Amino acid sequence: NVAVIGNNRPKALPVSEIDFSRLSENNPKICTYEAKWVTDSPVYLKTPPVCPADISRELEQELFSIAVKAYNALGCRDYARIDMRMGEDGIPKVLEVNPNPDISQNAGFARSAAADGLDYSRLILEIVRMAHNRYQDSEQ
């Protein structure tokens, strides 16, 4: 997935991925409820997030471009997360645009921001600042 932040010039943050390589062949390569939320489950423990993702610079730039285009096309503002999956044809597919992803301190969005050098306090302040500026602009 790619976290995106900003309004006039949205910025893609480092790509994050879930590593499914430790799952058995019987487990689907999807982030199930158990894999996402049940912290002591074997599936959770075998699907660690990797951020930044270990991908080529070329693929990273392609994912950034797709994410920002999706963000703009759907009228997102302030922040959002774009979930993607690589197709068997090697082409990234957008699965979901989440305009209100989890931004808690241990969530993926904050992890991507931290990988970009934006600590949690600054991330939250930036989101609040953008929303405040939008509100002020709408009052004029």
Regions found by a protein language model. Name each.
Residues 1-62, 86-93:
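Phosphate-binding site of ATP-dependent enzymes
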Residues 54-140:
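ATP-dependent carboxylate activation and anion-phosphoryl transfer catalytic cores
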